[in-house]
């Protein structure tokens, strides 16, 4: 079915704003809650922002690249948008839920589509204890940080930290160390998608750590739990033959 009600959103970048004006003039603008499809104009960062902001609407999002990276985006073209939307293939992403507790006892809940990362917030290395499903798996990881990522997020920070690229349909999460010092050769682990990962910060006052969920940070954490949330669905649309599975494969041969 060819969608008629399209809601456009765009990043503040001039090139994205220019595209927004052109698209609205050509296809009209529908309020997002009433739209059949949301079209996001920008880069991957703006796509993540759009998915977070429209999470409660359960409306598919089609990205058009007006940014830098565009891994989650389709190519930009002014012509034939309705036809592209009618032929687009849908991918379902389940995000991560982060529960972070600070030294002051505050509890923060965050959603992450790509990854949850812990990073040292001072000059000294972070010391982390890692548990999986309530069982301690590593008493002490000395590192710059660690992260847990989804398959969709495995080509982002995880890949830069030498973590594995995960097939989009894989029911696994990647746990990846960031610049590990001890154990020196430990890079991480592949875990079931149902796993709950807990990080406890050792000597948090001397070695402060921050937690980050898709760019939203919590400082001075003492513990962080991360798990996948199957009840939350993000719906992404891609042009045929250019879905996330193909992109993940392609990234490994660049």
Curated annotation (Swiss-Prot):
Q: Name one GO molecular function term.
A: ATP binding
Q: Which keywords does this chain's UniProt record carry? A: ATP-binding, Cytoplasm, Kinase, NAD, NADP, Nucleotide-binding, Transferase
Can you list the GO cellular component terms from the UniProt entry?
A: cytoplasm
| Protein origin, superkingdom | Bacteria
Q: Where in the cell is it found?
A: Cytoplasm
Disulfides per UniProt: none
Q: Pfam families recorded for this chain?
A: NAD_kinase, NAD_kinase_C
> SUPFAM superfamilies, per this entry?
NAD kinase/diacylglycerol kinase-like
Name the EC number(s). 2.7.1.23
Protein name (Swiss-Prot/TrEMBL): NAD kinase
Taxonomy, top ranks, is: Bacteria, Pseudomonadati, Pseudomonadota, Alphaproteobacteria, Rhodobacterales
């Amino acid at each position: 079915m060819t969608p008629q009600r399209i809601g456009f959103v765009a990043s503040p970048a001039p090139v994205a704003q220019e595209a927004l004006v052109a698209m609205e003039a050509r296809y009209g603008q529908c309020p997002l809650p009433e739209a059949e499809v949301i079209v996001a104009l920008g880069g991957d960062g703006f796509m993540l922002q759009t998915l977070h902001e429209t999470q409660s609407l359960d409306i598919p999002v089609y990205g058009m690249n007006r940014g830098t990276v565009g891994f989650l985006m389709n190519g930009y073209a002014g012509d034939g948008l309705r036809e592209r939307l009618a032929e687009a293939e849908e991918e379902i992403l389940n995000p991560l839920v982060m529960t972070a507790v600070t030294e002051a006892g505050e509890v923060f809940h965050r959603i992450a589509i790509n990854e949850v990362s812990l990073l040292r917030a001072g000059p000294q290395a972070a010391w982390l204890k890692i548990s999986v499903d309530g069982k301690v798996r590593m008493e002490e990881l000395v590192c710059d940080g660690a992260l847990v990522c989804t398959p969709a997020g495995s080509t982002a920070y995880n890949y830069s930290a030498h973590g594995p690229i995960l097939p989009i349909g894989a029911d696994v999460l990647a746990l990846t160390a960031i610049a590990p010092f001890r154990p020196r050769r430990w890079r991480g682990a592949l875990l079931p998608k149902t796993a709950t990962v807990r990080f406890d910060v050792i000597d948090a006052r001397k070695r402060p750590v921050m937690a980050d969920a898709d760019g939203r940070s919590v400082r001075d954490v003492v513990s962080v739990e991360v798990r996948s949330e199957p009840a939350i669905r993000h719906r992404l649309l891609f042009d045929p033959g250019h879905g996330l599975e193909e992109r993940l494969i392609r990234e490994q041969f660049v």
